[in-house]
């Protein structure tokens, strides 16, 4: 991974008193773009495992080992939870998360305290040291988008999101990730506001942004667009946790049952 990176503003009129990248990232005013975050071999491993799992699930569906879902909808999106659906990629997924934490420590140390409630020196150990990390439901994951696939505007509601492009640009048309200004989040959900920023970075690029940022996966017109995603916060210790917070935070967009996503994805491949 090269040390070069850039800051892409969501809010163009950044306050001069808080113009450092770490503060802007934590406040949801910008997205950090890290090229060459994930190399070709790592991408190939994730993609091979994801496509094999999709094919295996299709065989189960055809053979009757897995019953049809109660509802059918052509979402064009399949979400594969790495620990459960891609266990052979578990170590690689952890490696990418550690890499993101090390990047923040090295390049944006102030973001650790603001976004994850820890000092810069603690960042590299967050994944392994108690109490560990808490993920958005179903993550870390590999998302596969086929024609018509998209992810509606939502917020992840976690401390930090790491989104890594796995597909080369010539493998799909359409797509990209859209971001809205904080003031436009309600309008974005109603489809009444244009995004302030749309990014379609090359394969291997990571996007880092905060949990309150309204964003969406734009509609794929053809081909397959694949992403690795991990949205996480520092897990609260038992002494810090409240009874009402025993369940994980849920992203704002209603999530389909896994079976619904799978059936729609398989329909799109046929």
PLM segments and residue spans:
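Catalytic core of non-heme Fe(II) oxygenases with the double-stranded beta-helix
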Residues: 125-244
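Non-heme Fe(II)/2-oxoglutarate
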Residues: 5-129, 148, 246-249
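Double-stranded beta-helix
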Residues: 27-29, 54, 177, 182, ...
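Intrinsically disordered, low-complexity peptide-like regions
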Residues: 72, 86, 141, 152, ...
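Universal eukaryotic N-terminal targeting presequences
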Residues: 1-2
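Acidic-enriched, low-complexity/disordered segments with a strong bias for Aspartate over Glutamate
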Residues: 15, 20, 36-39, 88, ...
């Amino acid at each position: 991974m090269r040390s070069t990176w850039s800051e892409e503003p969501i809010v163009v009129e950044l306050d001069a008193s808080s113009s450092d990248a770490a503060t802007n990232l934590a406040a949801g005013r910008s997205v950090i773009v890290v090229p060459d975050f994930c190399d070709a071999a790592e991408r190939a491993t994730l993609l091979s495992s994801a496509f094999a799992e999709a094919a295996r699930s299709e065989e189960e569906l055809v053979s009757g080992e897995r019953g049809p879902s109660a509802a059918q909808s052509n979402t064009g999106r399949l979400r594969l939870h790495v620990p459960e659906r891609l266990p052979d990629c578990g170590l690689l997924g952890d490696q990418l998360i550690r890499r993101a934490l090390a990047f923040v420590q090295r390049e944006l140390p102030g973001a650790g305290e603001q976004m994850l409630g820890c000092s810069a020196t603690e960042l590299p150990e967050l994944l392994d040291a108690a109490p560990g990390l808490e993920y958005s439901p179903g993550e870390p994951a590999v998302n596969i988008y086929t024609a018509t696939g998209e992810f509606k505007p939502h917020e992840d509601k976690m401390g930090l999101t790491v989104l890594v492009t796995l597909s080369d640009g010539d493998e799909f048309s359409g797509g990209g990730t859209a971001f809205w200004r904080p003031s436009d989040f309600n309008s974005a959900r109603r489809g009444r506001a244009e995004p302030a920023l749309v990014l379609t970075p090359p394969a291997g690029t990571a996007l880092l942004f905060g949990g309150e940022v309204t964003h969406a996966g734009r509609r794929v017109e053809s081909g397959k667009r694949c992403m690795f995603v991990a949205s996480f916060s520092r897990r609260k210790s038992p002494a810090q946790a409240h009874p009402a917070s025993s369940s994980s935070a849920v992203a704002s967009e209603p999530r389909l049952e896994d079976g619904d996503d799978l059936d729609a994805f398989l329909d799109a491949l046929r």
